[in-house]
């Protein structure tokens, strides 16, 4: 998968318009971060990419195929998704949750294999949850559940990861660990993020949304500016640059002239 083309995408709930004519060509083989204040439409846009929301108006095309025409099993083999909420009705262990990521490769009633369990062990190790394999998923903390759900994505062996606020509930150690991990997979990532400095560190391309529209798209150096912070977030801040030329947002406004 190389490209996702979104054209004139609208979405409404009742009389409220959530997405207002989204148009963008997004690389599906790089790390793309969606930015913007709460309620701007980031999660809703992502849910169109992984087909939770049907398309009401406009189009979403992955490479040359409209997403509605991609068979669900094929889509699940290509795209791994980690949403914001992880409610589980039954008492599954962490290992069982991760094993579900192999479902797109299974026929009905096909048993899990030794190779499947090996993938699960490796994935849990990569997210720092190997010792929790037999623990109840529902008894894990929010951050631990996040890491287990990412492990489930990893065993899908997808070409694209869609992550909705993947650093929620994580302490800074695991925020950095998870983003470093997904960055190093060598596959496409589209992630909604709130931390602008983390987005600048890990994303190749930033997509900034405001009030259901895409306001601007560019590299971290192009996007993270004093003017953008004021326009999108309504805050005064200073922007400096590290040794690699990446922007760093400093919210201590008393330093501003």
Task: Annotate each predicted stretch with a short phrase.
Residues 155-159:
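A short, proline-enriched helix->beta-strand linker immediately N-terminal to the Walker B motif
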Residues 99, 114-132:
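Conserved ABC ATPase "signature" region
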């Amino acid at each position: 998968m190389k490209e996702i083309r979104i054209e004139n995408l609208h979405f409404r709930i009742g009389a409220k318009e959530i997405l207002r004519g989204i148009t963008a060509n997004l690389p599906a083989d790089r790390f793309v971060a969606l930015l913007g204040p709460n309620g701007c439409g980031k999660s809703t846009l992502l849910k169109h990419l992984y087909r939770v929301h049907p398309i009401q108006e406009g189009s979403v095309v992955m490479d040359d195929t409209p997403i509605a025409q991609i068979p669900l099993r094929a889509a699940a083999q290509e795209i791994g998704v980690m949403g914001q909420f992880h409610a589980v009705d039954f008492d599954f262990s962490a290992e069982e949750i991760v094993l579900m990521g192999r479902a797109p490769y299974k026929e009905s009633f096909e048993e899990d294999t030794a190779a499947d369990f090996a993938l699960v062990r490796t994935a849990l190790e990569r997210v720092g949850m190997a010792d929790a394999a037999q623990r109840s998923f529902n008894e894990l903390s929010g951050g631990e559940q996040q890491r287990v759900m990412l492990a489930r994505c990893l065993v899908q062996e997808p070409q694209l990861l869609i992550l909705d606020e993947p650093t929620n509930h994580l302490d800074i150690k695991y925020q950095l660990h998870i983003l470093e991990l997904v960055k190093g997979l060598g596959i496409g990532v589209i992630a909604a993020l709130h931390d602008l400095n983390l987005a600048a560190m890990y994303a190749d391309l930033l997509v900034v949304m405001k009030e259901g529209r895409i306001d601007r798209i560019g590299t971290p150096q192009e996007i993270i500016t004093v003017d953008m912070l004021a326009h999108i977030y309504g805050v005064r801040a200073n922007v400096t640059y590290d040794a690699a030329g990446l922007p760093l947002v400093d919210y201590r406004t008393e330093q501003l002239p």
